[in-house]
Amino acid sequence: MNKVRSILAAVAIAAITIAANADTPAENPLTPAPKHERQSPSIEQKLRTFDTLDFDVFSNQKWERLHESHAKDIVITWPDGHETKGIDKHIDDLKALFVFAPDIQIKTHPIRFGSGTFTGVTGVMTGTFTTPMPVGEGKFIQPTGKRFALSMATIGHWSGKTMDHEWLFWDNQDFMKQIGVGQ
């Protein structure tokens, strides 16, 4: 009986330790997303393209491959509502994210679905604020060394095999708080 109690105590301590070391609710939600529901073949193909986009192209900065998922004249609607047009501008904007957090990655899409010409995915974007963040006019925010893990979502409208409009969503206030420069 004592041996069973010892084993149960060890398991409980291990579980508490793992939970205490969990980085953020975004990475370790209390209630995980349900299992992926199979979509139509055309939607599944677009979702695979989305996975490749985030997990490989974005996370490894393979900008020469962005055309595999983005049209040349793509419109991007950013979390703050501003829009940009064109794949070259989008690449420049994406590169800017890696200036202050060179280790940014997206490695999971817990929710993936689509209908017709639209797809939607959620993800977790992680990184560490390790180099100065340019804020314009030659000014910078100095790095805090803090890690971030943001819940994000992307809605894509597809024309053929590429997106012609992409809507990006994440909480900028939460991001600034996580990197130690916001309230």
Residue ranges of predicted features:
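Bacterial N-terminal signal peptides that target proteins for export
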Residues: 1-8
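Bacterial N-terminal signal peptides
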Residues: 9-17
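C-terminal and inter-domain tail/linker signature
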Residues: 21-183
